[in-house]
Regions:
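Conserved catalytic core of the tyrosine transesterase superfamily
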Residues: 1-205
Length: 205
């Protein structure tokens, strides 16, 4: 029957290539992480937006740190433009709550179109290392309200994986997810299908 067939397909071993386990956040973990920064401070508001945007858009850390003010287009169809691997440009639609955070944040920045979206106090773009450190710091703080984050290694790429899994859970096909993430090869996107044990269980029910 269909269940037996699906079980057989899932039992087929993957190609003998080096694989990396995909680490992603649950909805509760993502919510706790985004809520961790102290938004009474300028740095806290910056960090909250960075975490939120990383999870909503799935941008690579290099793409996040290279965003400029004019990378954001606010309007009836708000979107973000970024330059990814191979200098390939892609456009990502923005959710309403993301637009609200961006609008508030942009009002705090100098009106310089080519200025960094995520600057330091000195006005220079955040580095990849700085993003990694702030994510680790806020993850530790968020563990106080979400115990499953305790001891969890959350990196910039974890935010990207979280976005991909959210899209997958929403029923988005892997071809569309590949375009969203800027994958040049759809096989790269297939790792999320294999990683999603919850989806496998639902399929077998």
């Amino acid at each position: 029957d269909a269940v037996a067939t699906i079980s057989q397909v899932l039992a087929i071993p993957a190609k003998r290539t080096k694989t990396t386990l995909v680490s992603f956040l649950t909805a509760a973990e993502a919510e706790a992480l985004i809520a961790a920064p102290d938004t009474r401070t300028w740095l806290g508001r910056r960090d909250r937006l960075l975490l939120h945007l990383g999870i909503q858009t799935g941008l690579r850390v290099s793409e996040l740190t290279s965003l400029h003010i004019d990378s954001i287009q606010i309007g009836p169809h708000s979107q973000l433009e970024c330059i990814g691997k191979g200098r390939k440009q892609r456009v990502i639609p923005l959710q309403k709550n993301t637009v609200q955070l961006l609008t508030a944040w942009l009002s705090e920045l100098p009106s310089t179109p080519d200025g960094p979206l995520f600057p330091t106090h000195a006005g220079t773009p955040l580095t990849r290392a700085a993003v990694g450190k702030l994510i680790a710091r806020h993850t530790a703080a968020a563990a106080g309200r979400c115990s499953s984050l305790a001891g969890k290694n959350v990196t910039p790429h974890t935010l990207r994986h979280t976005c991909a899994m959210s899209l997958l859970h929403a029923g988005i096909d892997t071809a569309s997810i590949a375009l969203w993430l800027g994958h040049s090869n759809i096989q790269t996107t297939q790792i999320y299908l294999h990683a999603d044990l919850e989806l496998k269980r639902r399929t077998l029910e």
